[in-house]
């Protein structure tokens, strides 16, 4: 067995039978085929920033280290072809240095470019789907490489086709980004709204987003974590109206389909759970949406804490939180909501 602790940001004491860095597509095909022949579970992992290992993984972990960025342009757009192993935050920083704008709101989101479409990562009013041109996929069953358009990816809130029809036996080897040269800053959320739209530049937004995230979110090098543990729940307008009568100050964000998104961190905070500790796992003091490895936490500590939070929020608000983090059991991914029921 090999130590998985350095390869996931929760930094839990788990192992895998074997861990292999993948640097080219032929190697990826060969390693996948070998796992199939030997009937071994296989897990494709980027930087492990959005996973919770429930137990030792009884198979092979393939680390996506496919690197490289290609930049082309026309009169109206910049086009970036980014291989899946590239670090997302470093890509955002690089793009601004190159005078390519539009990714700045997504600064400091952990993980690889190849993981970004799976969750449809988003922050401060921008989601991956807003900048995605295509996603390049390898079908490991047939060794065919194909591209899915933005529409074909079926992006939703922290959701995509890569969590469903293309969840198993497919790997994102590259993403295509399309960024307008007619840059318009997105300043909807938080302290970004205080910036002057007519004078602000992308570097200032990048710096502000980094400052906000660093002030609210723990550094995984200090306290292991996987960022936002729960999704922000989206509820019906009727249910929201009932809640607002009881909690007039409840933060909320109307959605295009008429439903209303709530702030999961606020719900957890209202239950008095900031700083709450169970075993070695705890709710972060600054951001209740983040669960941390406070001190030598085990996987079961994190699961029990998540269960406790979910129950408390449901008892108070009649809203059931869903994990945003992917749960990995000994032979592969499992339903995260079921795991904490």
Curated annotation (Swiss-Prot):
Keywords: Cell cycle, Cell division, Cell shape, Cell wall biogenesis/degradation, Cytoplasm, FAD, Flavoprotein, NADP, Oxidoreductase, Peptidoglycan synthesis
Keyword Chloroplast on entry: no
EC class name: oxidoreductase
Reactions that this protein is recorded to catalyse: UDP-N-acetyl-alpha-D-muramate + NADP(+) = UDP-N-acetyl-3-O-(1-carboxyvinyl)-alpha-D-glucosamine + NADPH + H(+)
Keyword Cell membrane annotated: no
GO CC list: cytosol
Entry's localization field: Cytoplasm
Active site: 158, 228, 324
GO biological process, one term: regulation of cell shape
Pathway the protein takes part in: Cell wall biogenesis; peptidoglycan biosynthesis
Cofactor(s) for this UniProt protein: FAD
Domain FAD-binding PCMH-type stretches: 12-182
InterPro entries linked: FAD-bd_PCMH, FAD-bd_PCMH-like_sf, FAD-bd_PCMH_sub1, FAD-bd_PCMH_sub2, MurB, MurB_C, MurB_C_sf, Oxid_FAD_bind_N
Disulphide linkage map: none
Family: Belongs to the MurB family.
NCBIfam families: murB, PRK00046.1, PRK13903.1
Protein name: UDP-N-acetylenolpyruvoylglucosamine reductase
């Amino acid at each position: 067995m090999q130590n998985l602790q350095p390869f996931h940001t929760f930094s839990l004491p788990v192992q895998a039978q074997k861990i292999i860095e993948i640097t080219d597509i032929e190697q990826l095909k060969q390693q996948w085929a070998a796992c199939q022949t030997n009937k071994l579970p296989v897990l494709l992992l980027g930087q492990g920033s959005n996973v919770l290992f429930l137990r030792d993984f009884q198979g092979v972990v393939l680390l996506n280290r496919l690197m490289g960025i290609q930049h082309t342009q026309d009169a109206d757009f910049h086009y970036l072809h980014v291989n899946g192993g590239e670090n997302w935050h470093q890509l955002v920083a690089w793009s601004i240095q190159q005078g390519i704008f539009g990714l700045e709101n997504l600064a400091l989101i952990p993980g690889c470019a190849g993981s970004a479409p799976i969750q449809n990562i988003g922050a401060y009013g921008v989601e991956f789907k807003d900048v995605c041109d295509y996603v390049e996929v390898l079908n490991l069953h047939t060794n065919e490489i194909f591209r899915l358009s933005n529409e074909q990816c079926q992006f939703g809130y922290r959701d995509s086709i890569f969590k469903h029809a293309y969840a198993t036996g497919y790997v994102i080897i590259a993403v295509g980004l399309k960024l307008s040269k007619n840059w318009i800053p997105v300043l909807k959320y938080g302290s970004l709204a205080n910036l002057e739209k007519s004078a602000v530049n992308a570097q200032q937004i990048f710096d502000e987003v980094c400052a906000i995230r660093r002030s609210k979110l723990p550094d995984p090098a200090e306290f292991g974590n996987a960022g936002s543990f729960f999704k922000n729940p989206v509820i019906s307008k009727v249910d929201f109206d009932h809640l607002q009568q009881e909690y007039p100050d409840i933060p909320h964000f109307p959605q295009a389909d008429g439903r209303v998104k709530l702030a999961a961190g606020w719900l957890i905070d209202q239950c008095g759970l900031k700083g709450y500790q169970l075993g070695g796992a705890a709710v972060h003091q600054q951001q209740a949406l983040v669960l941390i490895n406070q001190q030598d936490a085990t996987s079961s500590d994190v699961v029990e804490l998540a269960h406790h939070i979910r129950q408390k929020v449901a008892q108070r608000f009649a809203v059931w939180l869903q994990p945003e983090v992917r749960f990995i059991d000994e032979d592969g991914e499992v339903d995260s909501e079921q795991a904490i029921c």
